Structures are given as structure tokens and as C-alpha cells.
Amino acid sequence: HIFTEFGSFTVGESGATLFSIINQKQQNDRESWYMIDSSFMTTLPDIWGINQRYILLAINNWDKEYQRVFLGGLTCDSEDYYNGESHSNAIFLPKLNGGPQYIGFFHTGAYQESLGGFGGIQHCLIPAPKHIIIDREKGDNEYYTRLFAKEQSYRSMMRILGY
């Protein structure tokens, strides 16, 4: 009998996390920050915990002009950011043009959900994100999605806290 654990090195490409850019902040004359709609500390804890590198891509607006950016999360914690300098030389994403901008971290593996927890109370009360399963039938080129779990509601978080 062979026992194994399906982690980053065997099924790492099975995980992806998508974020929406909710705002842009000009820190100084050189630093343009894109703020995501979640927290790196709760959604992808290995980013700040062990400086894990992931494939980062823009999901849309590939035909737009790009600029160097820094990525920050929603919390007030000084560690809630994606350090482009330790993960790659620089991060370049499409310039914001008033429409939505989505980004994806790919090959996140099996551990981020276990480390961040699902359905419990997250750092700074950031709700657990919606989870979807993307699949396709063998021999079919179409992808199908189904909802695995809705985004965590404030009611469920308050219930866990005893309110």
C-alpha cells in the first residue's frame, strides 16, 4: 500500500484564487498600489508566512497598457501585501480604466484552505470567499462550473462568535 498526501508538488495546479481589484492607491511618485477585495493573510497565507511564489496573471484587460504595481489586502495589518520584490522582480498589471480588473494566483495547491480555514473566523473578520469547482467532461473542450460553497455571510460569522 502506498499512502500519499496530495499537496503542492503533486496536484499544485489544482488550486487558483481570483481577486477583484477594488481600488488604486498612489503611495508616492513611484508606488502604485492595487488593493484586492480580500486579504492575502486569510486567503493565501503562505504568501506572507513563507514568501511562497505563485503564478500571478491578469484575468481580463490583456490588451490594455500595463504598469508596475504593488498589491495590498483589505486588512490594516502591515504584512497583508504581496511582496513583488521577493516573489519576482516586479509585478506588471493592466492600468485601471474604470471597469473591473480581476487577477488570479495559480497553482496554489491544497494547503491554503486548510491554513486559512473555511467557515470559521478569519483574521480581521474577513469572510471566507465563494468556492467554485471548474470541471470538464473527458473528451469535451467545454468547462463547467458549480458552486461548492457560498461566500461566508456576516450572520454565520456572528453565530460562531455567539451572537
Regions flagged by a language model, labelled:
Residues H1-Y163:
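Charged (often Lys/Glu-rich) extended helix/loop segments that serve as interaction or gating elements
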